[in-house]
Amino acid sequence: MSAKEKFTSISPAEFFKRNPELAGFSNPARAMYQALRELVENALDATDVHEILPSIKVIIERTSQEKEIYRLTVEDNGIGIPPHVVPDAFGRVLYSSKYVLRQTRGMYGLGVKAAVLYSQMYQDKPIEITTAPLNSKRIYSFKLKIDVTKNEPIIYERGSVNNDTGYHGTSVSMYILGDWMRAKSRVYEYIKRTYIITPYAEFYFKDPEGNVVLYPRLTNKMPVPPKEVKPHPYGVDIELLKNMISRQKEDTTVKEFLVKEFQSVGEKTALSVIEMAGLDPDKRVQKLTDDQLSKLVDAMKNFPDFRPPSPEALSTIGADLIELGLKQTFNPEYVGAVTRRPKAYQGHPFIVEVGLAYGGDIQPSEEPTVLRYANKIPLIYDEKSDVVWKVVEEIDWKRYGIEDEQLPLVVMVHLCSTKVPYKSAGKESIADVEEIEKEIRNGIMEASRSLKTFMTEKRKEEEARKRLLTYLKYIPELARSLSIFVTDGKKELAPKVQEEIQNKMIDLVVTKLNIKDKDLELFKSYRVETL
């Protein structure tokens, strides 16, 4: 090693400023989409997680003609942010309210801060935040940047005004270098896919070209919000254990620690785990050596009688809301959805939901349209590297009654978990975890069985329709023969009588057999000329 070689450390902010692609900010188009996504997800977490019907306003404005600098504004009606938290929430990387065992859209305390770092790289204006917590008598405003070297906020302005209207929520504006023409389709697709699974929300979206799109609220029914839960013993490691122990009182025993800090652990279970680890249950937990901690972790991971992790930390969308969103967006001939039972991997609970839509306004293609979601986040990029796509590709749709080479089919998959195994900090694709892959496959197969029943009934109806129309071909001939009989061969009267008989028979058949308009038009084409 050279004697002149120097070693140094950098802050988390400096690291992500140097490597923005790790957080999804790899180019102006992707960065524009990613920044908008981070702001919208924070807005939704501030509303539906707290049982507030979301009203989200999204505005993108171009502010410079020389460079493609855009002002992104996202406003919500959520719980707001306490003013003393705002600087760190937007100006300190890896600072977050989401480091708890509860399902949230965000995970790392990174997203919006990565957007702020990207914003600072190409223009000088700070991020602007206006917020009012629930029942706050003041509305607070901030302008700030991130000190990259120190990983702390630089506050340029702060202030407050009276809140005379009872307003609560948050508005965030940031300026970024973007590429609207390349990002446009992704941004619109993101908002559409978000709306599919949040039909209880209303969105106002205005793009840089002045186009305004309104997404109305379709229902007031909301998913049950997640609850914060204790860690499960199967998900523990030595570092997590040390961190938890550091927050205990000095006289806390090993048994008390296990019972108080972990789910699925009562006194009897705690004593069994401690016995497996060869420890004294009355020993102070802060006095455990590294070797003893290692034995305790091994015992916790290998104890066979823990209950599965609690699903209370999860919030599913629900089959009803999935079906409502798919119907509104695709106007399908068939729609169905299932919510699977909770499962677990590495001590973390997860639930898979699957929705299928077929026919109607769905455009046929060689492959199904796949909508991927994780913790209610639409995943737009990196589709083919996702485990969901891998499973969908392996499904033989002919087994479920879809014989066409061109598939008018939408497959929607939602994974919710306290720990989604993303492949990167950009949160765009789910890793191939065996337990999750198996459950996604089972979920699609379960949903597809209902689709198969529909396709079977549809095929029977089509075959019955063909037989019926074959029989209906003879009605005009029958009407003509009857008209000759009724008029006693008087040709001048026969045409009128034939028309009357034929119309009455049509009305009778249409009423009794519930023939649809398209079939009626086909039937009318079988009429023969009157005498």
Curated annotation (Swiss-Prot):
CDD domains: TopoIIB_Trans
Top-level taxon in the UniProt lineage: Archaea
Reaction(s) catalysed by this chain's protein: ATP-dependent breakage, passage and rejoining of double-stranded DNA
Any Pfam family hit: HATPase_c
Primary role: Relaxes both positive and negative superturns and exhibits a strong decatenase activity.
Family: Belongs to the TOP6B family.
Assembly mode: Homodimer. Heterotetramer of two Top6A and two Top6B chains.
Protein name: Type 2 DNA topoisomerase 6 subunit B
